[in-house]
Regions:
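Membrane-integrated ABC transporters
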Residues: 1-32, 38-206, 212, 216, ...
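An intracellular "coupling" helix at the cytosolic face of ABC transporter transmembrane type-1 domains
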Residues: 10, 248-249, 265-274, 278, ...
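Helix-loop-helix
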Residues: 290, 294-311, 315, 321, ...
């Protein structure tokens, strides 16, 4: 998988940008529970009072606190407030604080955060001291100053500190808020408006963060799609380019259906995984770690619940991953098998129908289909177990948080809003793992797909251009020499060709004939370097073909395969395939030589007539003639015909060979011709007779009829004595 991911390198900037956006999205998501907590704790429970420090306080209330304060506390309080009298108060101040119209009020100065915290704790202590004194005064029906003179302030301050330590921070904060709320009410302030303003302002902030999160998510989705699509495009191009450079040996390693699957299905699998990785896998750890940090900062003693849940989730994911990974590997191979069966069925449909074997092929397909269905059911069921388990864990975690959290709320350790925020963070942690779990469904298949693609990309090309290529001699043209050539297919024990030696001359035709399996097609496929010789050498124009570039070698060859192969497009595009800059005269001449002019001219659109993939909309003979015309357009030095006249009738065959021979004489082109019919090679300048990979005869027809027994047998099996005598 990691070897394939190197193709993401051109998109590193977009990936970094996506990561930054994910971080922004996570920040927005993690901020919203804090605002929800503040809305519940401060906005609802504390009536919008944010701080434990009085922003405004009446003079008599402040003086009552100073009764319980020591000298340093008095200095802190008096230095933090300024006295405003009704005569000096502004109109705005009187509107906001109606009590300023009739009595003196202290307003909080602009103090730093450290001093504000110290002031808050001091006021809380004084408030609790006042509660202690007031409680005893009520019990003894005495005045507060009287009690202070009798018992002293320190005794009550000590009791207040003890009470604060017993109560949780939540309870103390709530009690402090009640003092502030009462004071603000006595000041005539609109507490309902204060509460509404706080809730609305906090709610708008939440909406802003939600909008920011949505924008980040949309941008990440856009970037992820572009990165994955670009990655897939580059990878497909790389695979396609690699396959186009495969030798026949490499192509035999992978089936056609497998290469198609690897280029389409496997790369598509990786594309989907990259999108999910950028949108989920990268996001999940950010949101998960961030939520855990917020949980730890919250001070709630329930982190162990999350730790337990995470351990269980990881265990389940790893277990299922280990079970399904091998099955996904098998599944991809079965998809290859299915494609192979379908391809064979479609290619051989005429033969299947001719022998009434539709039922047999249906059984083959049903078997392949059943195998895929069986393993798909297994993997799908295994993965389907994940989601219910995760939902169960999520609900169980929620119940545990509520159970243990309610006890902490009851003891005053935390507030209700804090429990709600904790639940939100816990859900974010669990959802992060849930998202990763969803991706793990794709990761095993993606890993298998990556390995299969890497197999193609890492395959060593067996036929390569030399590091220091030579150039062809300008003094020679169309000379092909075989020198003690032997060849065997990779992995085979026996040689297909053994010690073959001959030489062709420009403008002459060299024909190859022999029984089926004698090595005729193999021999001529060595000339364009579709395979490399096992031993010996092949020279073209005096240069070993292994010492020149393949492109240079093949540019001198006009190759016509045994099975005429046309590409989708039209007749003209197929003919121009061998020489893009061919003129109209070149095309017309090629059609004439290949005896294609007549049937092409009869088509309504002429050479612009459409050709289906594989040339399925023309007859076999027409397909073969157009294949020959394509080679002729190039005007090559060397023609290679691999039994290319077998689909032609005798009359067309004779006309075509006559026209071709005339053209080759004019252009001094060499012809290498594989034939099954003696009649096609009677007038060849040189005939090579092959038998079981060995050259058993070489010469003209007349010479071979005298010297080669194998040739005599072939000739007598195809022609009568009278026909042979008249040759």
């Amino acid at each position: 998988m990691t070897k394939i991911l190197k193709y993401l390198k051109p998109y590193w900037l977009s990936i970094v940008l996506a990561f930054g956006l994910l971080f922004g999205q996570a920040t927005c998501e993690l901020t919203m529970p804090d605002y929800m907590q503040n809305i519940v704790n401060t906005g609802i429970q504390n009536a919008g009072i944010e701080s434990g420090v009085y922003q405004q306080i009446r003079e008599k209330t402040l003086n009552s606190y100073l009764m319980f304060a020591n000298d340093s506390e008095k200095d802190l309080i008096t230095s933090s407030y300024k006295l405003v009298t009704p005569s000096k108060a502004t109109k705005e101040e009187k509107t906001e604080i109606p009590a300023l119209k009739t009595e003196n009020v202290y307003l909080l100065k602009d103090i730093n955060e450290e001093k504000e915290e110290k002031l808050s704790s001091t006021l809380t202590l004084l408030q609790m001291t006042m509660v202690e004194v007031s409680k005893e005064a009520k019990e003894q029906n005495a005045q507060i100053p009287q009690l202070l003179m009798m018992n002293g302030v320190d005794a009550y301050r000590k009791g207040a500190k003890s009470e604060i330590s017993k109560l949780g921070d939540s309870t103390v904060s709530s009690m402090s808020s009640q003092f502030l709320k009462k004071e603000y009410t006595d000041l005539g302030m609109n507490m309902e408006k204060m509460q509404q303003d706080y809730i609305i302002f906090s709610g708008l902030k939440m909406l802003g963060y939600a909008l920011g999160s949505a924008v980040c998510a949309i941008l990440v989705g856009f970037l992820a799609s572009r990165i994955a699509a670009g990655f897939s495009k580059d990878l497909r191009e790389e695979v396609f380019e690699k396959v186009t450079h495969f030798s026949n040996e490499n192509l035999n390693t992978f089936s056609t259906s497998s290469l198609i699957t690897r280029t389409t299905n496997d790369i598509q699998q990786l594309q989907m995984t990259i999108v999910m990785f950028l949108r989920i896998v990268m996001y999940a750890p950010i949101i998960g770690v961030g939520a855990i940090l917020h949980v730890i900062e919250s001070g709630a003693n329930m982190t162990w619940i999350l730790a337990l849940c995470v351990v269980v989730i990881l265990s389940v994911v790893l277990l299922i991953f280990m079970i399904v990974m091998p099955k996904f590997k098998i599944m991809q191979k079965m998809i290859d098998k299915m494609n192979s069966v379908v391809r064979e069925l479609l290619d051989g449909m005429l033969v299947i129908r001719a022998f009434n074997n539709e039922k047999l092929e249906e059984k083959k397909f049903d078997q392949a289909n059943s195998d895929i269905t069986s393993i798909s059911l297994f993997t799908t069921r295994a993965m389907a177990i994940m989601m219910p388990i995760m939902m169960f864990l999520m609900n169980g975690t929620t119940l545990m948080i509520l159970w243990f959290g309610s006890k902490q709320v009851d003891s005053g350790m935390i507030q209700v809003g804090s429990i709600m925020a904790f639940m939100q963070y816990a859900m974010q942690v669990i959802m992060a793992f849930l998202m990763i779990t969803m991706v793990t469904i794709m990761l095993p298949r993606a890993n298998v797909s990556a390995l299969r693609i890497h197999e193609v990309l890492s395959s060593e090309i067996t036929i390569k251009d030399p590091s220091n290529p030579m150039n062809f001699s300008s003094s020679m043209r169309g000379v092909v020499s075989f020198k003690n050539v032997s060849f065997k297919y990779p992995g085979a024990d026996e040689e297909v060709l053994s010690d073959i030696s001959f030489e062709t001359k420009p403008g002459e035709t060299t024909a190859f004939i022999g029984s089926t399996g004698s090595g005729k097609s193999t021999l001529i496929n060595l000339v364009p370097r579709f395979y490399d010789v096992t031993s010996g050498s092949i020279l073209v124009d005096g240069v070993d073909i292994r010492n020149v570039k393949q492109a240079d070698l093949r540019s001198r060859i006009g190759y016509v395969p045994q099975k005429g192969m046309l590409l989708s497009g039209d007749i003209e595009s197929n003919l121009l395939y061998s020489k893009k800059d061919a003129s109209k005269d070149d095309i017309s001449n090629a059609l004439s030589i290949s005896q294609s002019t007549e049937f092409v001219s009869k088509k309504p659109e002429g050479i612009h007539s459409e050709i289906n993939q594989g040339g399925t909309n023309v007859s076999g003979g027409q397909r073969q003639r157009l294949s020959i015309a394509r080679a002729v357009v190039r005007k090559p030095e060397i023609y290679i015909f691999d039994d290319s006249f077998s689909a032609l009738d005798f009359k067309t065959d004779a006309k075509l060979r006559e026209a071709l021979a005339k053209s080759c004489k004019e252009t001094k082109s060499t012809v290498l011709l594989v034939a099954q019919r003696i009649s096609s090679i009677l007038h060849a300048d040189q005939i090579i007779v092959l038998d079981e990979g060995k050259m058993v005869g070489k010469g003209t027809h007349a010479q071979l009829m005298k010297s080669c027994e194998v040739y005599q047998q072939i000739a007598s099996s195809q022609l009568t004595k009278e026909e042979l005598a008249n040759v």
